[in-house]
Each structure stands twice: as structure tokens, then as C-alpha cells.
Regions:
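RNase H-like, Mg2+-dependent phosphodiesterase core
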Residues: 1-78, 85-268
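Short hydrophobic targeting helices and cationic amphipathic motifs
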Residues: 267, 271-275
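Short, intrinsically disordered C-terminal tails of secreted or membrane-associated proteins
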Residues: 290-291
């Protein structure tokens, strides 16, 4: 297309052409066009291309750790991550995901950095693209039995072990997995640095969130679908009004003290007790002094 033909096109037509494969060919013509609106279309296209290039580079960099294994001929690298260590109710959920090498999934990132809508979209893409996916949840009883850290680690072992395609290596988000007999790379903030870990974080997050939402029918008034088990004001009020449920982790405060029957009498202690903050000796000393 020459300048004469291009100059006779309507702005709306040019805008539509910039959404086709002809965009790159039309860019020089648009930049030289006298119409400011057409020049803005060209500038917008360049900005969009730069953004897409930056995103592609980010996604490729998320295979830096996996790349060390790919270079050794190890291609089934499982990313493993957890969701739910912090809440005081509900399970800890772990996912293990093996993506095909260098599979670029636009928007893939740490699940905490994504909206719920975006996580749901990526969940479907990951489930479709992945070589293998496994997801394991350990409930409150298991967490109370083992402690949250060990329960998380054991869930990771199980998630890796139950993959339909055996993992040849593992990249984990800041977790040591010494019992594995295959190579393991533990990565701090791995859910934003590794594609497979990011994918695992999304699978785990969506799976756990869906489960917590499903509990609203069984435990109305607790708001599990809203706070997902974290100790928010809504959650606190629900527990005060309706009591502790089987979903609550009895080894976590404040339920640990409640289950033991420990209920501070002093107002000062009650304030900190309600905030789930453990008292130190200085507060005990204050109470003793006041009582004298």
C-alpha cells in the first residue's frame, strides 16, 4: 500500500488494520501521515508491541531455573507450591505442575499478584497445557498433628509422588525437600521467578479458594468464602458468636488457648488474647503489680 492509498483511508479503517497482520507494514505510513489521530494510532501500536515484548521477556526469564535442568536433558521439571499456611481455618493445599519446556502462558505469575478472575482463566489454561498436574490438601487434623510446616512439606512430597508423569527434577518455592531422590532447587519467591512454581501456585490457590467457598452452605455465617480462613474481624466475630468448628486449626491461636480452656480474666490480658498475640513476661508483670 502506498501513501496515496493510505491517506484516503478513514481513521476507523486504519485502526482496524492495526489489529491485523498488516500492522507492521502500515506503521511507517501511519507515522508519516498528516493526521494526528493516525499518528496516535501508530504510537499506541508501538507502545503495545513494547509491552508485549517486555511480557514475553518476563515469561522467558521464568524458565531460567528450569533451563538449568533442560540443559542437562531433564525436561519433566515439576514446580511445587502451597497455599493456606497462614489461615487459622481450612486446609493447606499444595500443587505440583509440570509444564512443557518454554511454554509461554501470557499473564502467568505468582497467584497473589493476580485477580481472582485472572487466576480462574489461567487455571484452565494450565490444566490444558500441562504435562501433569497434582493437587493435595491436608486438613486441620493433619496440620494439628504434624504442625503446619511439616504438613506442608509432606503434602508437597505427596503432590510430587502422585503426578501422572514422574518428575525428573523439582523447583520448589522456598521449601527444602531432603527426602526426594531427584534434583531439587529451592527458590526464594519462586512463584514469581519460576513458570512451573507460578503455575502450581495458581492451581493450589484456585483449588483451595473454591473449596473454602463451598463451605458457606455447611457453615453459614462464618464467611469462609470471603476470608478463606484468615483471622479477619468478620471471622473473629463469627467464632465469638457461633463457636469453633472442625475446620479450625486447634494448634493455632486463639483456638489453642480456647481448646485448653485458658481464658484470661484481666482486661489487659483479654485485649491481647483477643488479638491472638502471645503475652510476654512484661505484661504478666504489669498484671501482678496492678493486683498488689
Amino acid at each position: 500500500m502506498d501513501n496515496d492509498v493510505f491517506s484516503k483511508l478513514k481513521v476507523a479503517d486504519i485502526k482496524a488494520l492495526f489489529e491485523t497482520e498488516q500492522a507492521l507494514e502500515l506503521l511507517p505510513l501511519a507515522q508519516e501521515d498528516d493526521r494526528s489521530s493516525v499518528q496516535k494510532l501508530a504510537a499506541s501500536y508501538i507502545k503495545r508491541q513494547e509491552k508485549e515484548l517486555k511480557e514475553q521477556q518476563r515469561l522467558m526469564s521464568m524458565y531460567d531455573y528450569e533451563g538449568m535442568f533442560y540443559d542437562q536433558g531433564i525436561y519433566h521439571v515439576a514446580g511445587v507450591d502451597e497455599v493456606g499456611r497462614g489461615p487459622i481455618a481450612g486446609p493447606v493445599t499444595v500443587a505440583a505442575v509440570i509444564l512443557p519446556p518454554m511454554t509461554l502462558i501470557p499473564g502467568l505469575n505468582d497467584s497473589k499478584k493476580l485477580t481472582e478472575e485472572k487466576r480462574e482463566i489461567l487455571y484452565d489454561i494450565i490444566m490444558k497445557e500441562a504435562v501433569a498436574v497434582s493437587c493435595i490438601s491436608y486438613g486441620p487434623e493433619k496440620i494439628d498433628e504434624l504442625n503446619i510446616y511439616e504438613a506442608t512439606r509432606q503434602a508437597m512430597y505427596e503432590a510430587i509422588r502422585t503426578l501422572s508423569v514422574p518428575a525428573e527434577a523439582v523447583v520448589a518455592d522456598a521449601m527444602k525437600l531432603p527426602d526426594l531422590t531427584i534434583p531439587v532447587e529451592s527458590i526464594i519467591k519462586g512463584d514469581s521467578k519460576s513458570a512451573n512454581i507460578a503455575a502450581a501456585s495458581i492451581i493450589a490457590k484456585v483449588t483451595r479458594d473454591r473449596y473454602m467457598k463451598s463451605l458457606d452452605d455447611e457453615y453459614p455465617g462464618y464467611g469462609f468464602g470471603i476470608h478463606k480462613g484468615y483471622y479477619t474481624e468478620l471471622h473473629k466475630e463469627a467464632v465469638e458468636q457461633q463457636g469453633v468448628t472442625p475446620l479450625h486449626r486447634k494448634s493455632f491461636e486463639p483456638f489453642k488457648s480456647i481448646v485448653r480452656g485458658v481464658k484470661p480474666k484481666c482486661l489487659l490480658i483479654n485485649l491481647f488474647y483477643d488479638s491472638t498475640i502471645k503475652l510476654t513476661s512484661i505484661f504478666v508483670l504489669i498484671v501482678l503489680v496492678v493486683s498488689l
